[in-house]
Amino acid sequence: MKDMSIPLLAAVSSSTEETVRPIADFHPTLWGNHFLKSAADVETIDAATQEQHAALKQEVRRMITTTANKLAQKLHMIDAVQRLGVAYHFEKEIEDELGKVSHDLDSDDLYVVSLRFRLFRQQGVKISCDVFDKFKDDEGKFKESLINDIRGMLSLYEAAYLAIRGEDILDEAIVFTTTHLKSVISISDHSHANSNLAEQIRHSLQIPLRKAAARLEARYFLDIYSRDDLHDETLLKFAKLDFNILQAAHQKEASIMTRWWNDLGFPKKVPYARDRIIETYIWMLLGVSYEPNLAFGRIFASKVVCMITTIDDTFDAYGTFEELTLFTEAVTRWDIGLIDTLPEYMKFIVKALLDIYREAEEELAKEGRSYGIPYAKQMMQELIILYFTEAKWLYKGYVPTFDEYKSVALRSIGLRTLAVASFVDLGDFIATKDNFECILKNAKSLKATETIGRLMDDIAGYKFEQKRGHNPSAVECYKNQHGVSEEEAVKELLLEVANSWKDINEELLNPTTVPLPMLQRLLYFARSGHFIYDDGHDRYTHSLMMKRQVALLLTEPLAI
């Protein structure tokens, strides 16, 4: 370990007696009051549209349950329903139909075998990866003849990302398919042939389906599916209508969040913090849910993220060590009476924080299910203590080892705080005291999701943070502990991220004491984190990089 020569927390200059604060200079909001104005223009879904939606829904349900007995057709139909984002309407039907083909193992079609494997694993069924042995040659390598089956190769590529640790054949499949699919793209770019399939390949190479946030993937796939010569017009129309109906509801929620943010006065009272209210809402739309019946959890989680962001920026970019000490005491004791000791900007933060949890508790108490709120408060208190630990490191100029860093930083990413806040809306039989206790103590997926979020965040932001004198990141701590280059450190951290995805996959195949909906929520958070931090970018902090996605999900309805 070594000491940094100059502590870079906010400090009081001895010569001027003025507080010097390492403000990060985040760019201003991109959306302002846009959704306050646009919400007034959102038309209420009329009765005729609702009736059309209901009729199409019944027709799609009939199609799912009466699809011809051909395995390929049935699997293709289920896959389309899921990728178009409307599977939440047909969960029982999909479960039943997959059950009917659970023992159908005779196919030698790479596309069918791979698709069946992926759909069953997505459903939580631990189908063996041995089904791919038939596609290897006598030397144990994938048969070269497979490269001519482009659709099959893409299907195998997507299936391989549902691997768990130790499934070497799936690791080999990713290498094999990636190499040859890139060749397909290269040829397509020169010949302009098979443009729709080439576009799917290009998209999948950028973000495999397993890592893709469902709502964004649905919006992308709606365009792809509409250009597929074999698309079903009824399913496509239903999916478009469903997307637009949900989008109208999401626009209103974005308006609610904007009004809450402005009414409390965040932009004026904490101007140093990131003003990302719409990006926060989108993050929760991807990480918590997009379904209409989970609006409370989506909005509550969005408010919690706003507080996490504001508090994180207070610790990183504004507060003095003395102020942070007082702030930590006030929050960990959860006592509004202690705010008199705080500077004005911190009084505002603490009051806003306590009010969010109090209001949620009062709302849930009306339904007799407020027991999740104490766990949510506890996670927030623990997060503040972790932030303060990192502040002490910086104040003392202390550089932790990688192992020491992980013991704090995996938790300080805030995922645990956020996940528990989102669980309060999962329902009486899921959001129970026992289940809260169990997931906090035993869930491998929780640590895996934290690992993905923290390491990808650090890889995306460590150079920016270095410029403003932030604590060392996972990249620097790994580099220092193991004596490797920056590039090698990043490579090793990405391997740890890949293994964490496998841990999530494994726990979803073996749900025991933790309910499946809680584990699925962690998968969604991992996906949303992948979207925010993929390719070494921080789309949340530098939100111009996600402006297009915000527009697709909130401002641009589909033509029907």
From Swiss-Prot:
Cited SUPFAM superfamilies: Terpenoid cyclases/Protein prenyltransferases, Terpenoid synthases
Name under which the protein is recorded: (E)-beta-farnesene synthase
Binding site for Mg(2+) 3: 457, 465
GO CC annotation, single: cytoplasm
Its job: Sesquiterpene cyclase catalyzing the production of beta-farnesene from farnesyl diphosphate.
Binding site for Mg(2+) 1: 312, 316
Chain span(s) of sequence motif DDXXD motif: 312-316
UniProt note: domains: The Asp-Asp-Xaa-Xaa-Asp/Glu (DDXXD/E) motif is important for the catalytic activity, presumably through binding to Mg(2+).
Organism: Citrus junos (Yuzu)
An individual GO BP term: diterpenoid biosynthetic process
Keywords annotated in UniProt: Cytoplasm, Lyase, Magnesium, Manganese, Metal-binding
Keyword Lyase: yes
Enzyme Commission number, as recorded: 4.2.3.47
